[in-house]
């Protein structure tokens, strides 16, 4: 199952063409465990959408580098990363409430305190809530490839989106993407390479080996067994 990050089309100035759509946190079929997690752990780890920029030091109760993950699915790999790096703060965004509930349940079970989650459109969160020059890392793992040619424009990785991410990264911050769809990997590489301000961290100027920091997902393990490839891209903000 792909992480379905709602991605708008853009006008000629790079502004998102909004579709009228509201996200209800309880949407989707919830298991009892997910419903329990949303009711009990959302007040602790959940972040409501706001038109105002967030203050990360206040949100997390401390100053620490912030990693933003867009489209965390059921949250298993995100929680693993959060637990492995207690010295960092993590904000995860996912539009499907069952995934948010599952992530909250896992985070509670693991006892992590350095994670906050949102159930909203990631592009709108970036525009309205994330301050410029504030993120150490942005992660986008296995977004929907929209593999049919007529749907390619729906892919979240487009020049305006990548430029938006660039503006939110600190100097030296990294945008890390991964996909199991080779054509999308090539598209990501083309988009990212066209933007002044990013440096490809690949020695061969294309893809990087999977870093130890990114856990292998069950979905990815299944792909490996079937002989599917996975492509990681890491681009640093250098100006």
Curated annotation (Swiss-Prot):
E.C. code: 2.1.1.33
Sequence positions that bind substrate: 148, 180, 217-220
Annotated positions binding S-adenosyl-L-methionine: 69, 94, 121, 144
Keywords of this entry: Methyltransferase, S-adenosyl-L-methionine, Transferase, tRNA processing
Pfam families: Methyltransf_4 (PF02390)
SUPFAM superfamilies, A to Z: S-adenosyl-L-methionine-dependent methyltransferases (SSF53335)
UniProt cross-references to InterPro entries, sorted A to Z: SAM-dependent_MTases_sf (IPR029063), tRNA_(Gua-N-7)_MeTrfase_Trmb (IPR003358), tRNA_methyltr_TrmB_bact (IPR055361)
Catalytic residues of the enzyme: 144
Region Interaction with RNA, annotated ranges: 150-155
Any single GO CC term annotated in Swiss-Prot or TrEMBL for this entry: tRNA methyltransferase complex
Molecular-function GO terms, alphabetical: tRNA (guanine(46)-N7)-methyltransferase activity
Catalysed reaction equations from the record: guanosine(46) in tRNA + S-adenosyl-L-methionine = N(7)-methylguanosine(46) in tRNA + S-adenosyl-L-homocysteine
Pathway assigned in UniProt: tRNA modification; N(7)-methylguanine-tRNA biosynthesis
HAMAP family: tRNA_methyltr_TrmB
Subunit relationships: Monomer.
Family designation: Belongs to the class I-like SAM-binding methyltransferase superfamily. TrmB family.
Cited function: Catalyzes the formation of N(7)-methylguanine at position 46 (m7G46) in tRNA.
This protein's name: tRNA (guanine-N(7)-)-methyltransferase
Organism: Salmonella paratyphi A (strain ATCC 9150 / SARB42)
Gene behind the chain: trmB
């Amino acid at each position: 199952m792909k992480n379905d990050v709602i991605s708008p089309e853009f006008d000629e100035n790079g502004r998102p063409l909004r579709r009228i759509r509201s996200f209800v946190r309880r949407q989707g079929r919830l298991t009892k465990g997910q419903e329990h997690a949303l009711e009990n752990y959302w007040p602790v780890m959940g972040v409501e959408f706001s038109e105002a920029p967030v203050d990360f030091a206040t949100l997390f109760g401390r100053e620490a580098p912030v990693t933003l993950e867009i489209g965390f699915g059921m949250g298993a790999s995100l929680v693993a990363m959060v637990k492995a790096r207690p010295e960092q703060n993590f904000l995860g965004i996912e539009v499907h409430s069952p995934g948010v509930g599952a992530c909250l349940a896992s985070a509670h079970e693991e006892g992590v305190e350095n994670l906050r989650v949102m159930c909203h459109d990631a592009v709108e969160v970036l525009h309205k809530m994330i301050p410029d020059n504030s993120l150490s890392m942005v992660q986008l793992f296995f977004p929907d490839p929209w593999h049919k040619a007529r749907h390619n424009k729906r892919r979240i990785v487009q020049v305006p989106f990548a430029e938006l991410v660039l503006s939110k990264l600190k100097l030296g911050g990294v945008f890390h993407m991964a996909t199991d769809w080779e054509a999308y990997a090539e598209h990501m590489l083309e988009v990212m390479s066209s933007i002044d301000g990013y440096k490809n961290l690949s020695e061969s100027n294309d893809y990087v080996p999977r870093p130890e920091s990114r856990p292998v997902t069950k979905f990815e393990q299944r792909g490996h067994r079937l002989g599917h490839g996975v492509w990681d891209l890491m681009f640093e903000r250098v100006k």
